[in-house]
């Protein structure tokens, strides 16, 4: 066990975690220069396209240190985006130390701080690494000063490297071997292993990634999942190189995988403890904190025939993304579906894209919503995250929405544009901190509902990519909230309802009505599209009717003949409007639900 090091790379988004992981893999000789490609651990197309890491990935690297010692390094590459902090916490629970990466040109950013605190909570050894020293804009001394002042770490211990050019990679590996302690655990104790990831293979069943803390597991053993008591016989164990590499056993301190033919997807839970059925441990390992979803949205299949297929895909997807929470839901307009909870808007987008790409699902997602707390006139309180279940306004005494404390770090020159953006999003109580010359940290309280839609994208736009953002939920505060209904031909469309602040209601209503007007095809009669709060109409668009020229066959003659034909047409249209139902195409829902991003 003294020959094992378990470590993770944590950093702000885009500070070079995946590039450094690529270089470490190359240095360990797992890939030849010919096989090499960028972002080697990011397996999903979507990760490579967006240039971000979504899933933590594990790889075991063989390394001979400078003093000739052979060491096994278990590296877990983590995501940097605020929405995937749960993936980071799972990775940290399996490590003894971390490399905290800081970009030499950008310095310490919001997510760097958030990840540092997470590593401190797990009591891990922290090695600061200053990356991107090859850039012309790199300011190493200033970055060292920030590491001292903002992170409270000894900057003289920081390792300098350029992951892109491959400089300083040996220094990073030596620091891992020298400074990160080997895992502690007892080989002769009963098996206890923590599941930190899992994915479904249609041939082999569920493949579980775990960190063994005590004991050992080998093929033929009968294991038990402690959360539900399910038992299975182990078929194969091994470690992760770039693909799975079978081993005779996994011993205490090792990170690897276990295949035991689990076909019941719900039996394997991330955060669960594996033990031997014949000699179980008395108590499970402390898992991870429960996930609290922040953003809610409903997912419906475009064709109602695909409902069961979507249910199956969600169950398999949940294995690989423990942060997703879902339950059954139904809508008059869209049929059967699922109400899902996400960690943020990027998480929502990724779930949508992965369901479409990896599981071949065609889906519609409703407007994202947050969880509101309502106090009713009878004194009871209720939590609502779905506009369909928003009670009658007469019954509501007060409504409260979640507020966050946002921490925004930006170059000083963007101060005006960022403050305007925050105030437009109903931000209050700004506080300013100047960590280093030319940089400002703004702390501000904002409603989560305003941040959920497009705040992060807009912040990146106004700061030309230099702004960084992190947030913590603080509390629910009383706000003037209303339910905005969209009516088409005087009928409510439940899938388009949303809960908004009264000040923003008209702006939203106009936006949705105008978008629907473009999408709904013309009928034989006029269609009114209205936005309403209760019985009060606050916005309207009209889809004009097709019109047949009924007077075309009248050549000259008495005007009363033409008038009679026009009156007859008018009556027919009126009758048609009373009985005619408007077909809203699925494309209209998709277009309107994207209206918030534009």
Curated annotation (Swiss-Prot):
Belongs to the TRAFAC class translation factor GTPase superfamily. Classic translation factor GTPase family. LepA subfamily. This is Elongation factor 4. It catalyses: GTP + H2O = GDP + phosphate + H(+). One of its GO terms (cellular component) is plasma membrane. One of its GO terms (biological process) is positive regulation of translation. Required for accurate and efficient protein synthesis under certain stress conditions. May act as a fidelity factor of the translation reaction, by catalyzing a one-codon backward translocation of tRNAs on improperly translocated ribosomes. Back-translocation proceeds from a post-translocation (POST) complex to a pre-translocation (PRE) complex, thus giving elongation factor G a second chance to translocate the tRNAs correctly. Binds to ribosomes in a GTP-dependent manner. It is a peripheral membrane protein. GTP binds at residues 14-19, 131-134. CDD domains: EF4_II (cd03699), EF4_III (cd16260), LepA (cd01890), lepA_C (cd03709). It is an enzyme of class 3 (hydrolase). Residues 2-184 form the tr-type G domain. The gene is lepA. GO terms for molecular function: GTP binding; GTPase activity; ribosome binding; translation elongation factor activity. Its main location: membrane. It holds the Pfam family EFG_C. Keywords: Cell inner membrane, Cell membrane, GTP-binding, Hydrolase, Membrane, Nucleotide-binding, Protein biosynthesis. It is found in: Cell inner membrane. Its EC number is 3.6.5.n1.
